[in-house]
Regions:
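Predominant activation on well-ordered alpha-helical scaffold segments within soluble catalytic domains
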Residues: 15, 35, 132-139, 168-171
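Alpha-helical metal-binding/catalytic segments enriched in His/Glu/Asp
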Residues: 90, 114-161
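Acidic/His- and Gly-rich active-site-bordering loop/insert found
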Residues: 1-119, 143, 147-148
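Single conserved hydrophobic/aromatic residue that forms the stacking wall/gate
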Residues: 177-188
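Short acidic, glycine/serine/threonine-rich loops at helix termini
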Residues: 102, 164-169
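Glycine-rich, phosphate-binding/catalytic loops in enzymes
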Residues: 105-109, 170-173, 185
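Structural signature of cysteine-dependent C-C bond-forming condensing enzymes
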Residues: 145, 172-176
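Generic structural signal for helix capping and beta-alpha/helix-loop junctions
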Residues: 54-55, 162-164
Length: 188
C-alpha cells in the first residue's frame, strides 16, 4: 500500500529523469539530478569520475577511446545507526543508447509521454525506471518507519550501454561498496 501511495510521484520522477539526454559522455547532468535527489533523502553520497587507470587491469575492463571526463558515477548509501544484518547493492545505469534519426520518432525522445499505462521516452525503461524504482522502494520502506538495519547502496553508473566500465568502477571500489547481495533492476 505504501508503494501505491508513492506511485504517481515515482512516475513524475521517472519522467523528469528521462528528460535528461544521458547519452555516452553526457550523463553528468542526469547524475547531478540524482545526486541532488539522494541528498534530499539524506543518503551518504559518493561521486567520482570513472578513471580508466583504476580499472584497466581488471579482467572485466573494456578498452575505450572516448573521453571519460564527464563519466561520473554516484552512490547513495543508507547507513543505519547500528549496522546489523545483510547489506544490499541496488545498481542501475544512467546512460542511454543514441536516439537515432530524429525524424523516425513520432515525438521528442527526451520529452516522455504517457499513453494509457505506457511511458514513451528514450531510456525510460532501460534503465531509468529501474534506478527510480530502487529509490522509491527505499522511500516506501522509510515512510513505513522500517529502516533497514544494514547498508543499502543505490548505485547509478555510466557506460553500461557500451562497456560496463561504470559498474566495474563501482566493483573495483569494493572496499566502499561491499554487500551480501546485489541487484540490477530489469524489466520483464
Amino acid at each position: 500500500i505504501e508503494v501505491d501511495k508513492l506511485f504517481d510521484d515515482q512516475i513524475r520522477f521517472t519522467q523528469k529523469l528521462t528528460r535528461f539526454p544521458s547519452l555516452r559522455g553526457q550523463e553528468h547532468t542526469a547524475q547531478d539530478f540524482l545526486f541532488d535527489e539522494l541528498t534530499k533523502r539524506n543518503y551518504a553520497l559518493d561521486r567520482w569520475t570513472v578513471n580508466v587507470e583504476d580499472i584497466k587491469d581488471h579482467p572485466g575492463f573494456s578498452p575505450v577511446k572516448v573521453d571519460y571526463s564527464n563519466a561520473i558515477n554516484i552512490v547513495g548509501t543508507h547507513r543505519p545507526k547500528k549496522e546489523m544484518g545483510r547489506s544490499l547493492i541496488l545498481n542501475g545505469h544512467i546512460d542511454v543508447v543514441p536516439e537515432g534519426p530524429y525524424e523516425m520518432w513520432s515525438r521528442n525522445p527526451f520529452d516522455p509521454a504517457i499513453e494509457g499505462d505506457w511511458m514513451y521516452g528514450r531510456g525510460g525503461a532501460d534503465m531509468k525506471a529501474g534506478i527510480v524504482a530502487n529509490i522509491f522502494a527505499m522511500d516506501a520502506i522509510r515512510n513505513l518507519g522500517c529502516l533497514p538495519a544494514a547498508r543499502v547502496h543505490i548505485q547509478s553508473v555510466v557506460e553500461e550501454e557500451c562497456t560496463g566500465n561504470g559498474a566495474l568502477a563501482c566493483l573495483v571500489s569494493c572496499l566502499l561498496y561491499t554487500s551480501d547481495a546485489a541487484d540490477e533492476m530489469r524489466r520483464g
